[in-house]
């Protein structure tokens, strides 16, 4: 270790993560009846890049459970998409009529959850296994406000491990 590192703050690994590679980073939108969208962040797609446009692509593994459907695919998603989702979830934790959105640049995973003001949320979701030309699954996940704090904490951990790099105007 150099003089600037310690065991609690390891340097970035070859995948651009600041956590040991054995530590999985998972973000899960859970709902009623076992429905969920689980996103495992595997690493940066271009760890050698530090700019906004190339450096923020993340390799992920997405698992979907909705009713009788199960599926898994491996899209590349962007760090700032997780930041926008986290910000929206935090708003909804305070405003039960709020909406949080996960909208991806290539359209492979879309989630829009709206609150009814009483603590219930309905997430309208769409997953596409190949960007622009793939098979598509649309589904809903019903959840309540108690699912939001753990989701926000997972998003905080994801963004700590894979922070947004640079700025779009740079």
Which residues does each predicted region cover?
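Charged, alpha-helix-forming regions
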Residues: 2-51, 55-67, 71, 75-77, ...
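DNA polymerase processivity clamps
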Residues: 44-51, 94-116, 166-170
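Beta-strand elements of well-folded, non-transmembrane domains
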Residues: 64-68, 79-81, 127-131, 145
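Short, structured motif recognition centered on aromatic/hydrophobic residues
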Residues: 82-89, 151, 155
């Amino acid at each position: 270790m150099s003089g600037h590192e310690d065991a609690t703050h390891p340097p970035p690994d070859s995948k651009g993560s600041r956590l040991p590679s054995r530590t999985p980073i998972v973000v899960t939108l859970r709902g009623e009846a076992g429905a969920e969208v689980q996103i495992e962040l595997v690493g940066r797609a271009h760890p050698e890049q530090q700019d906004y446009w190339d450096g923020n692509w993340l390799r992920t593994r997405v698992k979907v459970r909705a009713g009788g459907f199960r599926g898994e695919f491996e899209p590349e998603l962007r760090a700032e998409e997780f930041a926008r989702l986290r910000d929206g979830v935090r708003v909804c934790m305070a405003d039960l009529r709020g909406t949080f959105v996960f909208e991806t640049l290539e359209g492979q995973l879309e989630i829009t959850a709206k609150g009814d003001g009483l603590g219930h949320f309905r997430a309208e979701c769409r997953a596409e296994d190949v960007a622009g030309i793939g098979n598509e699954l649309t589904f809903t996940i019903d959840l309540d406000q108690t699912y939001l704090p753990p989701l926000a904490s997972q998003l905080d951990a994801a963004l700590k491990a894979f922070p947004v790099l640079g700025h779009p105007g740079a």
